[in-house]
Amino acid sequence: MRLVVQRVTSASVKVEEEITGAINEGYMVLVGVTHEDTEEDVHYLADKLAHLRIFEDENGKMNHSLLDVKGSVLSVSQFTLYGDTRKGRRPNFMKAAKPDAANALYECFNKALREKGIHVETGRFGAMMDVSLTNSGPVTIWMDSKE
């Protein structure tokens, strides 16, 4: 499972001109699922994300977690995180999980965050989405449960 985490002051996602999710301070997270992923990967990354210290303390050091600042998550499914660009000019997405399996693990990931007390807003799985955000810092982190 892969995540691209962006620290934001605000973020929202629209599907067909309807806002399906919006947050203020927190993380906008792109979530990608591959064939080998299990619930173990989900829980590992949900825990890591909840406790990742990339919010600044009073001294300007990245020392506070999402839980510390009571931030929210805008979670957006993103199969293209498994795009392979090594051959040709068009990405190959064969490493991305099939939609049914990916959606189940994506929903499990969001549930795991909610169980930690984190407010989670989402896009719509498999839909064409427009994501808007204000990246704070900017701070962008790549996380992979296998690496």
UniProtKB/Swiss-Prot annotation:
One of its GO terms (biological process) is D-amino acid catabolic process. Its EC number is 3.1.1.96. It is found in: Cytoplasm. Keywords: Cytoplasm, Hydrolase, RNA-binding, tRNA-binding. A motif (Gly-cisPro motif, important for rejection of L-amino acids) lies at residues 137-138. One of its GO terms (cellular component) is cytoplasm. Signal peptide: none annotated. GO terms for molecular function: D-tyrosyl-tRNA(Tyr) deacylase activity; Gly-tRNA(Ala) deacylase activity; Ser(Gly)-tRNA(Ala) hydrolase activity; tRNA binding. Belongs to the DTD family. A Gly-cisPro motif from one monomer fits into the active site of the other monomer to allow specific chiral rejection of L-amino acids. An aminoacyl-tRNA editing enzyme that deacylates mischarged D-aminoacyl-tRNAs. Also deacylates mischarged glycyl-tRNA(Ala), protecting cells against glycine mischarging by AlaRS. Acts via tRNA-based rather than protein-based catalysis; rejects L-amino acids rather than detecting D-amino acids in the active site. By recycling D-aminoacyl-tRNA to D-amino acids and free tRNA molecules, this enzyme counteracts the toxicity associated with the formation of D-aminoacyl-tRNA entities in vivo and helps enforce protein L-homochirality. This is D-aminoacyl-tRNA deacylase. It comes from Bacillus pumilus (strain SAFR-032).
